[in-house]
UniProtKB/Swiss-Prot annotation:
One of its GO terms (molecular function) is orotidine-5'-phosphate decarboxylase activity. Homodimer. This is Orotidine 5'-phosphate decarboxylase. It comes from Salmonella typhi. Catalyzes the decarboxylation of orotidine 5'-monophosphate (OMP) to uridine 5'-monophosphate (UMP). One of its GO terms (cellular component) is cytosol. NCBIfam families: PRK00230.1, pyrF.
Amino acid sequence: MTFTASSSSCAITESPVVVALDYHERDKALAFVDKIDPRDCRLKVGKEMFTLFGPQLVRDLQQRGFDVFLDLKFHDIPNTTARAVAAAADLGVWMVNVHASGGARMMAAARDALAPFSKDAPLLIAVTVLTSMGTSDLHDLGVTLSPAEHAERLARLTQQCGLDGVVCSAQEAVRFKQAFGAAFKLVTPGIRPAGSEAGDQRRIMTPEQALSAGVDYMVIGRPVTQSVDPAQTLKDINASLKREA
């Protein structure tokens, strides 16, 4: 089953699900993508796949009708980060991210780089604390706050810099929605349907729990990509979210 469209702008989905692609071979990635419907999810392309296959992979996904979250977590000096974010916007991605720990000047430069794109600009999201990190990991870096406290501090800085939202764990979502308002988007990895293995994500939730917590976009990987019937798995997840709503 293959779904095609002329560009990512043709994708129409109200689903909050973003499927994380994690493939070492381009053909296998596209074979998986051709089994699912762009009306049921968006797709996330990370560092490994983008390094292996480059911008053409993003174009291939867009041609199939999918919105793409380019998950490269830019973290560099302000000018370099701004140019990278603008390049992502030129590529037509739906969402791009930076590390909030890059600081206010870097995030503001990234935001300003998207101004020429107006309504066609991608969502600009900042990463707070990686979901694989616990308190001991932060202590190793000299951060004495808990992951939740550090994430909230970085999220507040992100909002002050005018970005669209943050990547955060689902456990932070309720507090973040209260602190930063409904318009501030929350993107959450580590989302796994009930019965899935935790993998390398320490702070996880089910899709239904994440929706109740206030998550706007939930990233789901192997429970979908390794499913024997990924299209049905997506439909089941979306149906459960509609019931929860």
